[in-house]
UniProtKB/Swiss-Prot annotation:
Belongs to the immunoglobulin superfamily. The chain crosses the membrane at residues 298-321. Residues 202-289 form the Ig-like C1-type domain. GO terms for cellular component: endosome membrane; plasma membrane. FcRn complex consists of two subunits: p51, and p14 which is equivalent to beta-2-microglobulin. It forms an MHC class I-like heterodimer. Interacts with albumin/ALB; this interaction regulates ALB homeostasis. Residues 111-200 are annotated as: Alpha-2. It comes from Mus musculus (Mouse). This is IgG receptor FcRn large subunit p51.
């Protein structure tokens, strides 16, 4: 199937049945980030696509291909769709990296340039566009798709806006995307993949113990590859509830999530404990004993490292997901390229999952 003609969107907007109420239709948003001088092995540009709080797309300058995430990997999309996403994001990558080079040349320093671009659907299925940009964590520019210009009050705004206005058709393409392509894509996702928004993937689990301080042990209950992200931990001692521990949750980069909870117990008492989780994907709570797993046979360190490697491909996913889930207006990051390694969740990994060497754990491809 070829690319749709310009008039096809107008016809689709008129004829599409109003099966989704405006209060249930999620926005489609692209979050773009470019950094100066990225840390070794990290991309200089990456993008994530979101349908409401659910990530459906990832792209980075190392792989240079747009890939679907989670349940959207099985969406019955038209043949050209992901090629078009890739082409558009490569164009955005070029614009963002050229802007960074120009800012560095004129003003010196290192920068993080970000954008939040997308749309919601009005009651008549027309686009309610969003196009805002941030520099080093502060919003500094907006794009008006109906006028076709970038505006803001910062000196840096003028530099970036003038650069982009000189690019052939850059403003026209941005307007076309926000007013036409974005609502068309959103409507297509809702028609072809509406069940994906109700996707449920149950977790795999593992319970491990390690020595703590002053005669204690620390239990780590880990849950892997689940969706939606809401999950409830519970530790059991001799079958009775013994608290939920200290919990953390983050995205894997493929649309699913991982989580863990830590509980300090008396050393020698570890085998009296079990870990239990409740999740929408489970018909009943899932319980696991110490040093055993449910629906998983891979060592916890290998799984967590695999998750870390996936997150590297979409650096910043943890922070971005947290902001998107919180409903904050824009998930801006203030880190420069030299600090981009801090976008990764390594500091939040449970101690037994910390890498001990390059060859310590199984690699993932």
């Amino acid at each position: 199937m070829g690319m749709p003609l310009p008039w096809a969107l107008s016809l689709l907007l008129v004829l599409l049945p109003q099966t989704w109420g405006s209060e249930t239709r999620p926005p489609l948003m692209y979050h773009l980030t470019a950094v100066s001088n990225p840390s070794t092995g990290l991309p200089s540009f990456w993008a994530t696509g979101w349908l409401g709080p659910q990530q459906y797309l990832t792209y980075n300058s190392l792989r240079q291909e747009a890939d679907p995430c989670g349940a959207w990997m099985w969406e019955n999309q038209v043949s050209w769709y992901w090629e078009k996403e890739t082409t558009d994001l490569k164009s955005k990558e070029q614009l963002f990296l050229e802007a960074l080079k120009t800012l560095e040349k004129i003003l010196n320093g290192t920068y993080t340039l970000q954008g939040l671009l997308g749309c919601e659907l009005a009651s008549d299925n027309s686009s309610v566009p969003t196009a805002v940009f941030a520099l080093n964590g502060e919003e500094f520019m907006k794009f008006n798709p109906r006028i076709g210009n970038w505006t803001g009050e910062w000196p840096e705004t003028e530099i970036v806006a003038n650069l982009w206005m000189k690019q052939p058709d850059a403003a026209r393409k941005e307007s076309e995307f926000l007013l036409n392509s974005c609502p068309e894509r959103l409507l297509g996702h809702l028609e072809r993949g509406r069940r994906n928004l109700e996707w449920k993937e149950p977790p795999s689990m593992r319970l491990k113990a390690r020595p703590g301080n002053s005669g204690s042990s620390v239990l780590t209950c880990a849950a892997f590859s689940f969706y939606p992200p809401e999950l409830k931990f519970r530790f059991l001692r001799n079958g009775l509830a013994s608290g939920s521990g200290n919990c953390s949750t983050g995205p894997n980069g493929d649309g699913s999530f991982h989580a863990w909870s830590l509980l300090e117990v008396k050393r020698g008492d570890e085998h009296h404990y079990q870990c239990q989780v409740e999740h929408e994907g489970l018909a009943q709570p899932l319980t696991v004993d110490l040093d055993s797993s449910a629906r998983s046979s891979v060592p916890v360190v290998g799984i967590v490292l695999g998750l870390l490697l996936v997150v590297v491909a979409i650096a910043g996913g943890v922070l971005l997901w947290g902001r998107m889930r919180s409903g904050l207006p824009a998930p801006w990051l203030s880190l420069s390229g030299d600090d981009s390694g801090d976008l990764l969740p390594g500091g939040n990994l449970p101690p037994e999952a910390e890498p001990q060497g390059a060859n310590a754990f199984p690699a993932t491809s």
